[in-house]
Regions:
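A cross-domain feature marking catalytic cores of carbohydrate-active enzymes
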Residues: 40, 67-69, 138-140
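Metal-dependent phosphodiesterase/phospholipase catalytic core, i.e.
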Residues: 2-23, 81-149
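Structural preference for beta-strand elements that scaffold enzyme active sites
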Residues: 35-37, 64, 135-137
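Short, motif-level signal for alpha-helix interfacial/capping segments enriched in acidic residues
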Residues: 16-19, 42-60, 118
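N-terminal signal-anchor transmembrane helix
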Residues: 19-38, 42-44, 51
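Catalytic domains of carbohydrate-active enzymes, especially glycoside hydrolases
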Residues: 53-71, 126
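Feature marks short, surface-exposed loop/turn motifs that line or immediately flank catalytic pockets
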Residues: 44, 73, 144
Length: 149
């Protein structure tokens, strides 16, 4: 009997979550207006995943941002799509194997925006800089499938 009650409770929770769950009771869009999100910020004048690119997107009228984060060796959360530093910065090596103090002066956008490079943004700094009314979709990057630390 207890198994039936637990199974029923599980099914009810699953149905409730699937059909009735809403993030923070916030209306994200209506049928007439889809939610348009700036993917990694607006990259027209600034490197992606930088505070400058997020502010640029907000100034352009975006009400939602998508940003990628990963964890450094010392536990800081930084905004970067890639683990390898060479792809989008003047750094060398892997972000997850480096302490934030080693990464904080690295310039992002050396290939895409050489006249407007920016430092790596920490998630904490982004949350302090971005207005509270902006919806954030934070994509957590993990180096392996089961790395959720």
């Amino acid at each position: 009997m207890i198994e039936l009650i637990l199974y029923s409770a599980f099914i009810l929770l699953l149905v409730r979550h699937r059909f009735f769950w809403v993030a923070r009771h916030r209306k994200l869009s209506s049928k007439d207006s889809p939610l348009i999100m700036a993917h990694r910020g607006l990259k027209t004048n600034s490197p992606e995943n930088t505070i400058s690119s997020y502010k640029e997107a907000i100034a352009a009228g975006f009400g939602a941002l998508e940003l990628d984060i990963l964890q450094t060796k010392d536990g800081e959360l930084i905004c970067s799509h890639n683990f390898d530093l060479e792809r989008e910065s003047n750094g060398v090596g892997w972000a997850q194997h480096s302490d934030y103090n080693k990464l904080k002066d690295i310039q992002m956008g050396v290939y895409t925006h050489p006249r407007n490079t920016q430092t790596i943004a920490r998630l904490e700094d982004v949350l302090n800089e971005i207005p509270k009314n902006i919806f954030l979709n934070i994509e957590i990057k993990t180096h392996s499938l089961f790395d959720l630390s």
